[in-house]
Design a protein with these regions (language model features):
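Pepsin/retropepsin-fold aspartyl endopeptidases
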Residues: 1-124
Length: 124
């Protein structure tokens, strides 16, 4: 199970992200259920982890505009297992998207310092 807290009306969790060169950094990510990819990170974190560039990706933002993202490869410690993921570069705070949470249940106590839990769903 992954846990976090609600701060300033944002549900957040801490994730350990690793680059192919072995560099590791813990990031605080805001959970965004409207974001369909796995994770976005700011350029400074991507550079610090020395993440390898993979490709470009287009996305529709919440305001309806289209944006082109650089996409990088990373590993993330997710509920005790290492997952290979694609990371969007975005000049904003890190976002945790729905793709990484697939197969998990998200619960949020929507109040200041409320508990956030992401728990693996039982297999069918």
């Amino acid at each position: 199970m992954i846990t976090g807290t609600v701060t300033d009306d944002e549900a957040t969790v801490r994730l350990v992200v690793k680059g192919s060169s072995g560099k590791v950094q813990e990031v605080r990510a805001v959970i965004d259920t409207g974001y369909t990819a796995s994770l976005s990170l700011p350029p400074v974190v991507i550079a610090a982890l020395d993440l390898p560039w993979q490709s470009f990706d287009r996305a529709i933002l919440a305001d309806g505009s289209e944006c082109l993202f650089d996409v990088f490869e990373a590993e993330v410690d997710w509920d005790g297992e290492v997952r290979q993921i694609l990371v969007h570069e975005a000049d904003a705070e890190p976002l945790l998207g729905m793709s990484l949470m697939r197969g998990f249940e998200l619960k949020v106590q929507v109040r200041n310092r409320g508990k956030v839990t992401i728990k693996r769903l039982p297999t069918r």
